[in-house]
Amino acid sequence: MATLAPPPSKRQRREEIQRTQTQQDVTPLVATDLGSFKANFIDSDGNQMTDVVEINFADATEKNISNLLNTLLGRDREEFTPYRFRIHIPGKDLIIDQYPNDLLSLLQKHGVTNPFETTITLSAEPQAIFKVHAVSRLAHRIPGHGQPILSCQFSPVSSSRLATGSGDNTARIWDTDSGTPKFTLKGHTGWVLGVSWSPDGKYLATCSMDTTVRVWDPESGKQVNQEFRGHAKWVLALAWQPYHLWRDGTARLASASKDCTVRIWLVNTGRTEHVLSGHKGSVSCVKWGGTDLIYTGSHDRSVRVWDAVKGTLVHNFTAHGHWVNHIALSSDHVLRTAYHDHTKEVPGTEEERRAKAKERFEKAAKIKGKVAERLVSASDDFTMYLWDPTNNGSKPVARLLGHQNKVNHVQFSPDGTLIASAGWDNSTKLWNARDGKFIKNLRGHVAPVYQCAWSADSRLVVTGSKDCTLKVWNVRTGKLAMDLPGHEDEVYAVDWAADGELVASGGKDKAVRTWRN
């Protein structure tokens, strides 16, 4: 029989408590004796934000420095803005994107021999003041579609409305609060490849292999006007004109087709305003920017920029060696949501709504004091390119290398500072949106990653894969925040609602799933 050690005596317990107390008293003394450094805060455009200040290395956590910067800027609790910091290594052309647990060790590791007498430059990037929680459980599994779900998108107004397009030739609008179908949108005679809500949430557009575009009223489920006819082949993608640019009392819609053209439609009449022709291959993706430029990516390996008002070509970017699969704009999130933000306050008049949408766009797209959207293109050649369309030259800002297979999908974070890319190499990668530098790999899927979507606060990314799972990633750490099994087959489409409440997914198993915290 095993002999048990006797319990510690009162004296032993008292000595242990005293020893622990002594350690706790000494630890702060040791910690605060790390020395200090001088911090120079700059904004993302390189402008100095405050005077140089001295900070103790022991207190130099990202949270503490964020609080200090707010104090230096004279902000009260109402105006408080959380920041993340990029560290410029002195004497080297090196910027560390992820703030470390131990700043002193990081500087010494990179050869800064005397950090105590060195001024360290910290780029401060504002973070969202609201926080989105990682979705962690299945809210609803909603059957209804008779074939795989190919696309899904939440209404910009609320996560309680979701649209999906399917291989059963229908689109559907779902009530995600109750987990029930609201409307089945019938009319297409081919697969519905894309669904897209207008920025004000008052229309839903669908595009199909039947060569048509249709616009629906999501409140009644009825079609608005006749179907838009003009394309000769499948219609692959849609893009709404940004809300602040709507004119003549009508919205405009762009559609990209396998027939190598893009058409601009007047929504209230269904008339074609312009046909953008020039691509020599299928136009796989289209985006409508906040300065009335239209961006297209094609299987002819080019990315083109068009003037939406005149219908003329502005730039032709040719750098990719294979098909362009997807393109994204740094302003995508604010253009998709127009005047809807985390406050849920909707301006009363049309003029005020326009003004708010324009203000949100200009704030999101500003680089060095001027409005300049960035564009990123993803290709079958395993690469991505970052472009500045305001630059007249056709030279990219950066070439983003690292994927070992085709890059399927790409998205800017809502705050415009990061890029996430999903690839056939089973990985999702994060990149700096300013200079295109690689930041980290999000590895965990065991099959190609088809799509990715950001949370509205830019702190989380959700990915959908051929391996039948969704995964939620913490962007700061690069770690898996939540694994979401539940699909019975490949996950083709994923979206995160603009209000942060829900994630939706759909794929080969034909059922829509919504996920919540």
Curated annotation (Swiss-Prot):
Disulfide bonds: none annotated. Residues 34-128 are annotated as: Ubiquitin-like (UBL) domain. The keyword Metal-binding does not apply. Keywords: Nucleus, Repeat, Ribosome biogenesis, WD repeat. One of its GO terms (biological process) is ribosomal large subunit assembly. The keyword Nucleus applies. WD repeats lie at residues 144-184, 187-226, 230-277, 278-316, 351-397, 402-441, 444-483, 486-517. Residues 1-25 are annotated as: Disordered. It comes from the Eukaryota. One of its GO terms (cellular component) is nucleolus. Transmembrane segments: none annotated. It is found in: Nucleus, Nucleolus. PANTHER family: NOTCHLESS PROTEIN HOMOLOG 1 (PTHR19848:SF0), WD40 REPEAT PROTEIN (PTHR19848). Associates with the pre-60S ribosomal particle. Interacts (via WD repeats) with uL18. Interacts (via UBL domain) with MDN1 (via VWFA/MIDAS domain). Interacts (via WD repeats) with NSA2. Involved in ribosome biogenesis. Required for processing and efficient intra-nuclear transport of pre-60S ribosomal subunits. Interacts with the AAA-ATPase Midasin, which is essential for the ATP-dependent dissociation of a group of nonribosomal factors from the pre-60S particle. This is Ribosome assembly protein 4.
